[in-house]
């Protein structure tokens, strides 16, 4: 199934987030039971690969499935998150996709304190600042999850 041309994405729950290609998203959250755990997303169209800034994505005529992986050493969590969500908004505009359906945010050391705030709180501030600059965005908010990891990358 992983090599099927109709596979939109493969989420690989491993020990460290990394980028291998547009189809495979490797998340730094290993399965508690050990062993490999893959989640496969398929579509009825053959997806096309693309990239925009630091976003790698796959698209069909009706959806975009993307990933953006950045080292958390690239800046403080608030600024990093703001930059990530600005890129996402720009890609949405570029591809004429108004709404996101679902967003998973994988944050390293989510409860660690940086500059007086938990990293999760700093993430929320940066995301809000990026979202708040997009006219009417509040009516298109997606379902979203923030998950803590033990590696050094932010993956959205």
Short names for language-model regions:
Residues 1-156:
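Short, polar/acidic, helix-capping and beta-turn segments at strand->helix junctions
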């Amino acid at each position: 199934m992983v090599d099927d041309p109709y596979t939109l994405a493969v989420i690989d729950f491993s020990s460290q987030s990394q980028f291998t290609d547009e189809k495979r998203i490797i998340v730094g959250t290993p399965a508690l039971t050990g062993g490999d755990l893959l989640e496969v997303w398929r579509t009825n169209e053959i997806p096309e690969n693309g990239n925009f800034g630091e976003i790698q994505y796959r698209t069909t005529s009706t959806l975009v499935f993307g990933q953006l992986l950045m080292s958390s050493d690239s800046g403080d969590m608030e600024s990093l998150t703001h930059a990530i969500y600005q890129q996402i908004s720009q890609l949405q505009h570029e591809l004429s996709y108004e709404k996101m359906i679902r967003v998973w945010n994988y944050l390293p050391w989510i409860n660690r304190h940086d500059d007086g705030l938990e990293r999760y709180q700093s993430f929320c501030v940066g995301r809000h600042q990026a979202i708040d600059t997009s006219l009417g965005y509040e009516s298109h908010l997606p379902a979203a999850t923030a998950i803590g990891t033990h590696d050094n990358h932010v993956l959205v």
